[in-house]
Every structure is written in C-alpha cells, then in structure tokens.
A protein has these predicted regions:
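Radical SAM [4Fe-4S] cluster-binding motif and immediate context
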Residues: 162, 167-332, 339, 352
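Catalytic cores of alpha/beta
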Residues: 101-107, 341-355
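Short N-terminal binding/cap micro-motifs at the start of the first secondary-structure element
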Residues: 15-20
Length: 471
C-alpha cells in the first residue's frame, strides 16, 4: 500500500528548539499509512523548494503558527502553496489558531482548516477524514470552510499525555539542531497545559486550566532511550511548568542518577512549586544535572503580583533564589513591566527586586519584557471591554511585536528608563569579560542610584561589539 504524504512546516524564527509540536502530531500518525515530511525553515535553507517538491503528491500541508513574525512566514508559504496547488488542503495549528480559530479562515483564502488546542488526536482524525473524504464535521477541535461558511466543531478534551507513544525524532535530522545550537542540546516536552490562572497569560483560555504530564517512570524511560540514541549532553525541557508535581521531578532526578545518565538539564519552575521541595529534592535535582531553572516573577510588587493573579508570594521567590544559590543552580527570572495603570511605586519595587536578585548570585539573570495585550488573557479581555482595539486581521497580527516595544500607554520617559535599566543591569551583573570590568562597576553604580543620564557606556559597548548589543 502506497503511503500518503503529509507535509509539516515549521516557520522561520530566531530560536532553534526542535519542532516538538510537529514531532508530536507526526508521531501520532501510523507510519505504515503516512509518510511524514517535516520541513523547518530555520534549518532547511531551501525550505520553499522542499515544500513545492513534495506538494504534488501530498495529502495536506500543515503549519504550526505563532503570532508575529512566524505567522508572517506561514502566510507567505501558504499563499505560495495555494497558488501552485489550489486543491491541496492547507491546515494551520498552534497558539495563534487556538486563540483565533475562525479569523484566518475569514481573512485569508490560503487557509482551509485550523486546529485548536492539543493536536495529536485531532490531527490524526483530520488526516484520516481527508484521506477517506469523510465529513469534517465529525472531527472535534477544528474550524473549516464549507461552501463559503466557516464551521467550528466542538472542542476536544485534553488527553492524558501518557497515552501517546514515544516521540519519533527520526522525523527530523537531530544532528542539524545540535549544529545550529552549537552544542548537543536535546529538547523534550513532558506535559501540556497549566493549572494556574495568571491574568496576563493565554494558557487558561486555551487549556481551561487543565494539565497532563508524563509519569516519572515514563520520563526516565524516554530520556534514557534518547540519551543512548543521540548521545546529547544537555536536556532542555520545554514544558510550561515542569515542576508542577515537585515530588515527581525528585523521583525523575533519582532515576537519572541511578541510570547513570550523565547530562545537564534545564526546566521551568513556579516559585510556589520550588518552595514545596525538600532540601533533599533540591540536592538530588542538582546531583542529577539540573543546571538552570526559569522562574517567572513578573513584578517586585506584591500588590501587582496579586493583581496579576500569580498566586505567589514574593517570599517564595526569594526562597527559591536562596536554594538555587545554595546548590549553584543558575536562574532566569523574567519580569513584565508596562502594564496599563502600573504605578511608579510598582515600578520602583520591581527595579529594587531585580537588583536584589542579581546581587545574590552571578548565575542569576533577569529578563525584562514589556506587557503586550495578547488575546485570551483576563487583562486583555478587560482592556477590550474598556475600548482598547486589538489588531483586527490576521495580517495585522502577523506584524504584532510582542517582545521589543512597549504599549502606547507607557510614557516615553518610562520607556527610556526601562531601556537604560535593562542595558545597565545586564552590563553590571551579567558581564563576564574581564576587560569590561570597569564599565560593569560603573553600570552597577548607575543601577543602584537609578542614574542613567548621558549613557556613554552604551555607545562605547556598541562601538566595541556592535554584533553583541546588551540591550
């Protein structure tokens, strides 16, 4: 029996994590029935040529879609496909279509079907229906066009992650990702969803505060299998909240030690999760290779933290920081500034907390981002109800910058202050080049005094190393 060809496309982006979403849906398909072709625009220099090469005999062309520049690339390649092969079904899935199920179908002629939420079972059913020309109304968790009308099917419930088979990384050339990263770093995801209700996050909207994760035994078995097969030295867990069940992660760490898996690893952690870990669990995680955690702080103001519905006390952040310092574990602490109505007092608390964390350990990094009203979050919903206008079309969302710039409600003075503080705090506490030590000392003084006038050091740094801007 001739296998049906499925093209899966990962759009261009500036990061090089393995395409875990595409690997998940590709693995869900029966390899005896389907030939899965993953094309990654970040890795494959001739990505467009490969897409057009495989398109003539493909059953469908599917993309994973993130809002912003990745969406722009998906629009471009989808249009190219439709112009060359107008009858080939084009499917979009991922975060953007989970938040905007119908919009791409209304706005664009190059999209036929969108997928919402967890994709493994949905995509498997979808391609079966396409192959057998069955009515798509019976596939849960999709939107599609039919005779000019956009039809949305009922949502699909979250499936237990342990019911899915081991991810087939043979669908990609793993060595290419090692080469692109410059190290043998392997990517895995062991859970989906999130229990928590953060008001700035879209997760509660997409997954309805549901969560599913591999068991410790399943994680250990998979890691051991991939470790022996790919001989990686570092493991990067891409889970939203990896330490949701701290005891289970402690059990995993013990398994890694007992199985003599010699790696380092990094993962995400909420401060309330880390604060529930015993000293022994921290020590075991470190012994197993834990090198870094990412702990979202968002604000140094408890009042702002409560408004954001983080359900975390700042004291727990400090506890985790102290534990990470004790066990020599690096930390990335992301903060978000520039919320609508954010007070100067809140900013002052955040700046002070950033400096406090940086001073605790040279292995602590703080990343400061500007709030952007991303759909699905409680804050954004309230802003829209109060008259704020979000981008109106798919094309406008493709031009949405949710990383670099601040919202229009942030004054020019406050934006300039944040930009200076971000630059000088990195230079002052994260700079490791010896010849810049004098500038680092000046930068720390500037941050401690909040004195950022005449930023001559920034101009000098950018002159010396224009390819390594610190801001």
């Amino acid at each position: 029996m001739e296998r049906k060809k499925i093209i899966l496309y990962n759009p261009y982006a500036v990061f090089f994590d393995m395409p875990l979403a595409l690997l998940a849906i590709g693995t869900a398909l029966d390899p005896e029935e389907y030939e899965v072709i993953i094309i990654d625009a970040r890795i494959d220099k001739n990505a467009d040529e490969l897409v057009l090469l495989h398109a003539p005999d493909a059953l469908c062309f599917a993309c994973t879609v993130l809002t912003g520049s990745p969406l722009k690339d998906v629009l471009r390649i989808s249009e190219k496909i439709k112009q060359a092969y107008p009858l080939l079904p084009v499917i979009w899935g991922g975060w953007h279509t989970s938040l905007f199920p119908k919009n791409p179908l209304v706005d664009e002629t190059c999209v036929d079907i969108t997928v919402q939420g967890q994709g493994e079972e949905t995509f498997k059913e979808l391609v079966t229906h396409l192959a057998q020309q069955l009515p798509l109304e019976n596939v849960k968790g999709i939107c599609f066009k039919k005779q000019g009308e956009v039809i949305q099917t009922p949502p699909r419930s979250l499936t237990d992650m342990n019911k899915f088979g081991r991810i087939n990384y043979e669908l990609i050339e793993v060595e290419k990702y090692f080469q692109k990263k410059g190290k043998r770093q392997f990517d895995m995801i062991t859970s989906i969803g999130c229990f928590f209700r953060c008001a700035f996050c879209a997760d509660p909207f997409v997954y309805n505060r549901k969560f599913s994760a591999y068991t410790a035994q399943r994680m250990a078995d998979d890691i051991e299998f991939f470790y022996k097969k790919y001989q990686f030295t570092d493991l990067n867990f891409q889970d939203e909240t990896f330490f949701t069940y701290p005891k289970q992660i402690g059990e995993l760490a013990t398994e890694l030690i007992n199985r003599n898996i010699k790696i380092t690893w990094a993962a995400t952690m909420r401060a309330d999760q880390g604060s529930r870990m015993s000293d022994q669990e921290w020590a075991t995680c470190k012994q197993s290779g834990l090198r870094r955690v990412l702990i979202g702080v968002e604000s140094g103001s408890q009042e702002m933290m409560d408004w954001l519905e983080k359900d975390i006390k700042i004291e727990k952040v400090l506890f985790c920081a102290a534990q990470c310092k004790k066990y020599n574990i690096d930390v990335i602490f992301p903060f978000i500034v520039g919320f609508p109505g954010e007070t100067d007092e809140s900013v002052t608390h955040t700046v002070a907390f950033v400096k406090k964390l940086k001073a605790m350990s040279p292995g602590f990094r703080t990343e400061i981002f500007y709030y952007k009203p991303y759909p699905g979050s409680k804050i954004t919903t309230n802003m829209v109800n109060e008259g704020y206008e979000l981008p109106a079309s798919t094309r406008e969302w493709a031009n949405f910058d949710y990383i670099g710039s601040s919202g229009p409600w942030v004054s020019k003075e406050k934006y300039t202050f944040f930009q200076h503080f971000k630059f000088y705090s990195k230079l002052g506490w994260e700079q490791k080049r010896i010849y810049l030590a004098p500038l680092a000392a000046i930068a720390r003084w500037r941050c401690n005094k909040n004195q950022f006038k005449f930023p001559w050091e920034k101009a000098l740094i950018e002159f010396l190393k224009p390819q390594q801007k610190l801001s």
